Amino acid sequence: MLNAKISVYGALLVLMVISYNTKLSFPSKETETRYKEVLEAEKDCYNYLSELFDKIDFRHHRLSRYDVQSKYYKEIRAKFPLLCSQMVLKAILETVGNWNTCIANNKDSFETPIKKHLSMILDKRLYSKLTNQTIELTVPGFKRVQCSFQCYPQLQKLFELYKPQNCNIFYKNGQFWLTIQFDIPNIEHIDGEALGIDRGIRRIVTCSDGTGWINREFNKERRKLRYLRRCLKAKNTKSSKRHLKKLSRTERNRSKNEVHRVVNWLLAKDYTTFVLEDLSKIKQSTSKKTITVDGQKKEIKRKKHNNRFGQIPLKEIQTTLEYKAPLLGKEVVTVEPAYTSQLDYRALPKGMRLGTRYCASDGELLDADGNAACNIVLRHRPDSIVVKPTYGSMVFSGRPMSTGQSWLQLVQTVATTSSQPLGCA
């Protein structure tokens, strides 16, 4: 089964990395069994280090991986003799990295990280002679073992175009998988117009050129899946938990598919810079509200708001756009999100927002999301060209097409009309 995913490391000027997963086969049952034992030992080593960090209070007294190596390397080698020295170092690197990530994200309120699956990070000391069909792995007790993997057509293209880098290996459902990483050089950014993008709940994206994306069928299906999830959680039986796991996978895949459709629709436009709001802390800042009880102010959770907000793939839209845009010579930038939906993009006195309508101070009725998108792009580039978001004039795509219009026709239509004024109904 083919499983490909793409990830971006560093800023846009740094090389991008494409990761491709393929099935891995060992030459004999003995080597396969031994390598599985190695992965289990590496998992136990990770969990041992994680529990050790908890005892020494790593949360408040951090150690670098070099400090951990100098203090606990001999102890770990003696406790896990099956692991070679480089495997121990990789386990230390992974454990320290995960702990630092947890501390940066949740500070003190996180449980001790525990590794449940079999996987290991490889480097040049743990593998060699990587070709488009074989790889030699270090297997304790067997030295270097030549293993083969399935070279899918897309993987063959990556080998022909790009240089492979480090690999990872993991074990899932009785099968070894090899993750091969390729360095992708960025295309030089092309100077051009900027497009402001406002993300929302019902309207997934609204743009400063008078267009937007809303898929009512997708929203309906998402509400249905959420209702089924609540029903299954209430039953709390073994079969309901199994069904719930399958339902979560379905919801995740459909959301991911919708995100890719939205991003492809955005990239089909004739803009080279996409401006988004920096919503990295939006859930923390809006998850609670202050009310007055008996003359005292009290913070309470906004449960309904949080449940609806958790259904929106805000970060996934940004991440997907950030790795696809540089491949086309385009870029993604973020701006401060404060007051983008409350201020008038024409620099007039502050108006009033009522649902999807924005009542400007001069009596003009604007589309609230369109006004926010204009504020976003003007905050990054004040001389940007925007289309006046008059209420009722926005052109939305992504709805179920009653005329049988295909997705390709829709992209072509948007691409040809994106350079024309879209402010008129």
Regions found by a protein language model. Give the residues of each.
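Gly/serine-rich nucleotide phosphate-binding loop at the start of the catalytic core
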Residues: L2-L93
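Short, low-complexity interaction segments enriched in Ser/Thr/Pro/Gly
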Residues: L2-N3, P113, I121, I385
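N-terminal cationic leader/targeting segments used for protein routing and processing
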Residues: A4-I6, K116-H117, P389
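Positively charged, helix-rich recognition surfaces that bind polyanionic ligands
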Residues: L15-T22, F26, T33, N173-A425
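Short amphipathic alpha-helical coiled-coil/interface segments
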Residues: E42, A91-W99, L225, L244-E251
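Stable alpha-helical structural segments in soluble proteins, enriched in small hydrophobic residues
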Residues: C45, L49, M87-C102, G370-H380, ...
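A generic secondary-structure signal for well-formed alpha-helical elements
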Residues: S50-F53, D57, W99, I103-N106, ...
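Acidic carboxylate diad motif detector
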Residues: D67-K172, N307, Q311
